[in-house]
A protein has these predicted regions:
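A structural signal for small-residue-enriched, beta-sheet-centric alpha/beta enzyme cores
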Residues: 1-73
Length: 73
């Protein structure tokens, strides 16, 4: 495959990881001021699930891309 495409995939994974973490930080702050604490907890639980699944996936993709690009250098 194309090295440029592979690089784009790695960049996308890294950006997705950062976006998930940044969005969760905002959620953690904003749920503290919510009156509906049960709903706030539902949002926090969902955020934790998404972080658990997708941050590790993004790391795996990024690591695999880095390894492949380094081998081709």
């Amino acid at each position: 495959g194309s090295r440029m495409l592979l690089s784009d995939v790695g960049c996308g994974a890294a950006l997705a990881r950062g976006s998930l973490i940044a969005a969760s930080h905002t959620l953690f702050v904003n749920t503290r001021s919510m009156y509906d604490t049960a709903y706030a907890q539902t949002l926090l639980d969902e955020a934790d699930k998404l972080l658990d699944i997708y941050v590790s996936r993004a790391d795996a993709v990024s690591d695999a891309v880095s390894a492949q690009l380094r081998q081709e250098a």
